[in-house]
């Protein structure tokens, strides 16, 4: 197919000026074209993040999902707002993809926001929000992670159980003791 050959030629040439044209493929109503665009952008050696984020806002659901997956794959922390927007306004399928992508686009600066979202998340959103909090904390030293999570647990009141998985992910014995104690008192 000519479109496929042309697309892969652009990828092989690798000129970053082709990125917006490749990102346009995500806006197609043809799922095969969207998948071609996703594969091409995933293989492209340059910085695709800005063009992909721009395409997500006006793409159909398949293109939004493909774009979110690309942003996650590229760890596009600068484009976290694109992912957060889709959590707010996307269709159920797009929201699910945005929640999955979230853990890959968060950084240390997003800890407070991610904790707030975890504490207000509905039941289906809790697991991906916990993964996002764990990811946001990951650049901190372990002792700081434990301290930050323990502080958030105190602030969360009766929603402190939401942080058990996050606290356990630190692997610290005192953190694990807190989790065990919490389970015992809540069961």
Stretches with model-predicted labels:
Residues 3-15, 24, 32-46, 51-54, ...:
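Structural detector for internal amphipathic alpha-helices that build alpha-solenoid repeat scaffolds
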Residues 6, 143, 150-154:
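Extended interaction regions within the primary functional domain
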Residues 17, 187:
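Conserved functional loop/turn residues at catalytic and ligand-binding sites
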Residues 18, 114-115, 145-149:
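HEAT/HEAT-like alpha-solenoid repeats
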Residues 46-50, 145-150:
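Repeat-mediated protein-protein interaction surfaces in helical alpha-solenoids
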């Amino acid at each position: 197919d000519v479109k496929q050959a042309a697309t892969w030629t652009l990828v092989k040439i690798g000129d970053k000026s082709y990125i917006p044209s490749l990102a346009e493929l995500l806006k197609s109503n043809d799922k095969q074209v969207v998948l071609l665009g996703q594969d091409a952008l995933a293989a492209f050696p340059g910085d695709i993040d800005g063009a992909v984020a721009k395409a997500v806002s006006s793409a159909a659901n398949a293109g939004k999902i493909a774009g979110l997956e690309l942003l996650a794959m590229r760890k596009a922390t600068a484009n976290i707002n694109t992912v957060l927007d889709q959590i707010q306004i996307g269709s159920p399928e797009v929201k699910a993809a945005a929640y999955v992508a979230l853990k890959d686009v968060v950084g240390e600066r997003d800890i407070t926001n991610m904790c707030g979202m975890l504490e207000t998340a509905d039941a289906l959103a809790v697991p991906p929000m916990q993964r996002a909090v764990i990811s946001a904390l990951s650049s901190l030293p372990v002792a700081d992670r434990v301290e930050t999570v323990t502080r958030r647990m105190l602030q969360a009141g009766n929603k402190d159980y939401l942080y058990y998985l996050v606290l356990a992910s630190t692997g610290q014995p005192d953190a694990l003791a807190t989790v065990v104690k919490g389970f015992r008192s809540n069961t």
